[in-house]
Amino acid sequence: MGRALLLLVLLAACAPLPEGPGLPYPGGFVRGSVVEGRFQAILPGAPLLVDADAEALYAAYPYQLLEVRAGKVQSLPLPGVPRFLRARPGLAVGLEGGVLTPRGLLPYPAQDALETPEGLYWVDAEGLHLEGRLLLPGSFRQVVAWEGEVVALGTEAHFFPSGRRLALPAPALKAQAARCGVAFLAEGGLAHLLTPTGLTPLGPAEDLAAWEDTLYLSPGERTLRCGGGP
């Protein structure tokens, strides 16, 4: 597996760079197989999903997860095609049969999930769950950890455990936590920044990511700083 992966990486490095919009991750963009920004690497191909924590970038493919750490690429097997990928607080990969975490495959039908020291928070059409316990009823698509709270997003944003809630302009399709709030992409192609006091529109986007004080949006490989400005 290691020699085959090395060959794929070398072949990708020799191939022409593919055209297309950059895929944002927390700290930069992946354009085709080329990782730019906070991490630097050549992947064997364009990933389906990408995310990162403070120390590693994860790129998900059918039946394979690549970890880029300290300039090295490691291949990890996946028992299926990934449906979602979360690197923070802990690694969680959504699959048809459950959620893969460092603790193993957990049999929850999640649309999104967070691996935390308290356990796996996950969301679906019934609500926000912690492992096998329903915490909040509702229909949610995204869940992030922000400022000591778990934020579940659907047509509304619910903050747990404080109980605060805010209506969203459209259902959330993707969300990531930044230092200044929760950046999310809504149906209709508009990005917003969510805080407990309200919403700030960020403009049109098809994908987004967040790291510390910076938001990454595509297409156009745009970056925004918390508080406004590039």
Segments (PLM) and residue ranges:
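Sec-dependent signal peptide recognition
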Residues: 2-7
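C-terminal motif of bacterial Sec signal peptides marking the signal peptidase cleavage site
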Residues: 12-13
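Repeated scaffold domains used in trafficking and secretory/extracellular systems
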Residues: 17-26, 45-54, 80-88, 108-118, ...
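Residue position within the beta-strands of beta-propeller blades
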Residues: 31, 59, 93-94, 122, ...
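Blade-level signature of beta-propeller repeat domains, shared across WD40, Kelch, NHL, RCC1
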Residues: 206-230
